């Protein structure tokens, strides 16, 4: 009479390995891409000249980080405010549209005044599946209007992009 060895240990081990593989895959390809952006480790760099006070700039950074949380599966590495760069970019945007074009930023400058619009630069890292991507220098524009119902930390979101 022949006896056969039990295949139960191999089956149990196979099921355990498959379960772990499924859990790792779900974490990496389902959970990570769907979670709000991690803003907890963002480096904040401020180079201000007095246009906005410290609490206004802090409010702009908080509003920006809150908005960037919608970048699911990403990490915000840095938020920068440089008053000179902000003024230069805002003036250039307004000058370009002066000859008949339009943009949300130029419209905000007309509506709120050049002295009430701010530009923040962001570095963002994202992971899509097995690929990493980086958005360095992603811009966010806000208008200071603390009385508005749309304002977050006193700032109204205007636009974002390069």
Short names for language-model regions:
Residues 2, 8-15, 22-134:
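Flexible low-complexity loop/turn motifs enriched in small/helix-breaking residues
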Residues 135-162:
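Short beta-strand edge/turn micro-motifs at domain boundaries
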């Amino acid at each position: 009479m022949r006896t056969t060895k039990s295949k139960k240990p191999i089956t149990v081990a196979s099921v355990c390995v498959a379960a772990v593989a499924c859990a790792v895959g779900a974490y990496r390809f389902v959970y990570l891409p769907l979670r709000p952006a991690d803003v907890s480790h963002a480096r904040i760099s401020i180079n201000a000249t007095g246009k906005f006070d410290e609490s206004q700039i802090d409010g702009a950074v908080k509003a920006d980080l809150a908005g960037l949380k919608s970048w699911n599966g990403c990490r915000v590495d840095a938020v920068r405010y440089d008053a000179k760069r902000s003024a230069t970019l805002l003036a250039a945007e307004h000058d370009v549209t002066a000859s008949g074009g339009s943009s949300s930023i130029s419209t905000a400058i007309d509506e709120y005044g050049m002295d009430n619009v701010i530009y923040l630069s962001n570095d963002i890292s994202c992971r899509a599946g097995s690929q990493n991507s980086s958005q360095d220098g992603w811009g966010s524009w806000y208008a200071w209007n603390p009385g508005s119902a749309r304002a977050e930390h006193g700032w109204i979101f205007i636009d974002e992009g390069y």
